[in-house]
């Protein structure tokens, strides 16, 4: 006896008609007739009286209907309960580069929370070095950082590419602009090593560094003429101060920025985290 047979039996019993039951279930009438007949054969007992007025339950049919109602109700509850258990919920701690947090992440995070309101999402911004350490220390579940990341305990997923550009408040060559003071995030900024190599190649030493706490502060500082900065092009394009700065391309070997999402290999993947990984795959499209 299968649950599908019980469902058909219940429908015929409630409707009192093969035709009406078939319409309600959106089944072919001959299929409903055959399934009822097979059920009676399996149980070796008549469940319905067939009359010109339709189908009427026998005593055995009345008895089976009570159990069919209970079984189908339990199956429905089990299905709903299982579906609910798969619904992502609970805390989800994500680390992110500030440039990612103000460009690509908000749109996807908003979409994610609209679909999964039971997830308690928190986003912590920092530089790549500190974010990797936060992942290793279990302070965040995963993080968007600049890659590639080479660490035995970490798994990484490619998210996107960006272009590192030099910005200034006036027109000129990149070589000329490198002579200006450089505006950076605090110590640990992921681009400092690149800048150091770039300046060494250009023969520039003892460059003045001015540190800022936020992306917008850096871009605003550049637009005000305080100096130059190296930033992802997407972050500059999305800034309200974009029209006040010039963008200069860097040599090809300095341009590429790969953004990856990292998490510990031994991290227990919750339903909320797995769903977020699925959202990351959407970011790639």
Swiss-Prot record:
**Residue range(s) of DNA binding per entry:** 18-37
What biological function has been recorded for the protein in this entry?
A: Regulates expression of the cell division protein ftsW, and is essential for cell viability during stationary phase.
Q: Where is the signal peptide?
A: none
Q: Name one GO biological process term.
A: division septum assembly
Q: Which residues form the HTH lysR-type domain?
A: 1-58
Family stated for the protein in its record: Belongs to the LysR transcriptional regulatory family.
Q: Which PANTHER family match?
A: HTH-TYPE TRANSCRIPTIONAL REGULATOR, HTH-TYPE TRANSCRIPTIONAL REGULATOR GLTR
What do the Gene Ontology cellular component annotations say? Answer: cytoplasm
| Transmembrane feature ranges | none
- Record carries keyword Zinc: no
Compartments, as annotated in UniProt: Cytoplasm
One Pfam family in the UniProt entry:
HTH_1
Q: What's this protein's name?
A: HTH-type transcriptional regulator YofA
From the UniProt record, which GO molecular function terms apply?
DNA-binding transcription factor activity; transcription cis-regulatory region binding
Primary subcellular site in the record, as a coarse category: cytoplasm
- Induction entry: Maximally expressed at stationary phase.
């Amino acid at each position: 006896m299968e649950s599908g047979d019980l469902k058909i039996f219940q429908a015929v019993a409630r409707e009192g008609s093969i035709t009406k039951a078939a319409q309600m279930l959106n089944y072919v009438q001959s299929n409903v007739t055959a399934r009822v007949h097979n059920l009676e054969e399996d149980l070796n007992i008549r469940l319905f009286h067939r009359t010109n007025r339709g189908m009427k339950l026998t005593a055995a049919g009345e008895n089976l209907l009570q159990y069919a109602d209970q079984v189908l109700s339990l199956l429905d509850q089990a299905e709903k309960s299982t579906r609910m258990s798969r619904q992502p919920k609970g805390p989800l701690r994500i680390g992110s580069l500030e440039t990612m947090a103000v460009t690509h992440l908000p749109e996807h995070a908003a979409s994610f929370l609209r679909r999964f309101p039971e997830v308690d999402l928190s986003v912590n911004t920092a530089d790549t070095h500190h974010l990797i350490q936060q992942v290793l220390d279990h302070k965040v579940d995963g993080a968007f950082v600049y890659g590639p990341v080479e660490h035995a305990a970490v798994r990484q997923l490619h998210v996107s590419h960006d272009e590192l550009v030099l910005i200034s408040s006036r027109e000129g060559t990149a070589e000329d602009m490198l002579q200006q003071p450089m505006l950076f995030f605090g110590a640990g900024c992921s681009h400092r090593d690149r800048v150091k190599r770039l300046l060494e190649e250009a023969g520039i030493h003892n460059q003045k560094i001015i540190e800022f706490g936020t992306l917008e502060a850096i871009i605003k500082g550049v637009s005000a003429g305080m100096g130059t900065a190296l930033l992802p092009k997407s972050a500059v394009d999305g800034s309200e101060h974009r029209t006040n700065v010039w963008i200069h391309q860097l040599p090809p070997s300095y341009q590429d920025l790969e953004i990856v999402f990292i998490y510990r290999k031994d991290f227990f993947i919750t339903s909320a985290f797995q769903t977020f990984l699925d959202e990351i795959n959407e970011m790639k499209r």
